[in-house]
From Swiss-Prot:
Family: Belongs to the bacterial ribosomal protein bS6 family.
Molecular-function GO terms, alphabetical: small ribosomal subunit rRNA binding; structural constituent of ribosome
Keyword hit for RNA-binding: yes
Lineage, broadest ranks: Bacteria, Pseudomonadati, Pseudomonadota, Alphaproteobacteria, Hyphomicrobiales
Keywords: Ribonucleoprotein, Ribosomal protein, RNA-binding, rRNA-binding
Chain segments carrying region Disordered: 97-153
GO-annotated biological processes: translation
Composition skew (Basic and acidic residues), residue ranges: 105-147
Function: Binds together with bS18 to 16S ribosomal RNA.
Gene3D superfamilies named among the record's database cross-references: 3.30.70.60
GO CC terms: cytosolic small ribosomal subunit
The protein's name: Small ribosomal subunit protein bS6
Native species: Bradyrhizobium sp. (strain BTAi1 / ATCC BAA-1182)
InterPro entries: Ribosomal_bS6, Ribosomal_bS6_sf, Ribosomal_S6_plastid/chlpt, Transl_elong_EF1B/ribsomal_bS6
């Protein structure tokens, strides 16, 4: 059977439970038509690049599907009918990605960065006079200041 990656965006004001119900409904459709969902990832609420149907944010969900094309057609038909789904995209792939997707790896990496305790670095030295920094090698010698212009001011 063909392999698909299917991503859908649900409205921001839909609860997490409603998004999980949508995901369960899509999984049920696939399994009812002889396929299987090998991986489900909920990427959470993320900002959209541009407004879609008056929404600035959406719940992102990824499904890795091993199913006939009729199952994908039925999923897309149901998502067109559903008011909670803003957009969807199904892509046929040669092989499904094992382990977490790129979005989940990014989320894990961001979480690790937060755990490092960065942020406030305490009091810093410096910020005042740094002394003579020497000549700039990329410029010629400085021209002398005019004594006359300094006296006039």
């Amino acid at each position: 059977m063909p392999l698909y990656e299917h991503v859908f965006l649900a409205r921001q004001d839909a609860s997490t439970q409603q998004v999980e119900e949508l995901t369960t409904q899509m999984t049920g459709i696939v399994e009812g038509l002889g396929g299987k969902v090998t991986k489900t990832e909920n990427w959470g609420v993320r900002s959209l690049t541009y407004r879609m149907n008056k929404n600035r944010k959406a719940h992102f969900v990824l499904l890795n599907i091993d199913a006939p094309s009729a199952a994908i057609a039925e999923i897309e038909r149901q998502e067109r009918i559903s008011e909670d789904v803003i957009r969807y995209l199904s892509v046929r792939v040669d092989e499904l990605e094992e382990g977490p997707s790129a979005m989940m790896r990014k989320a894990d990496r961001d979480r690790e960065r937060d755990d490092r305790g960065g942020g406030f670095r305490g009091e810093r030295d410096g910020g005042g006079f740094r002394g003579d920094r020497g000549d700039r090698g990329d410029r010629g010698p400085r021209r002398p200041r005019d004594e006359e212009t300094a006296d006039e001011e």
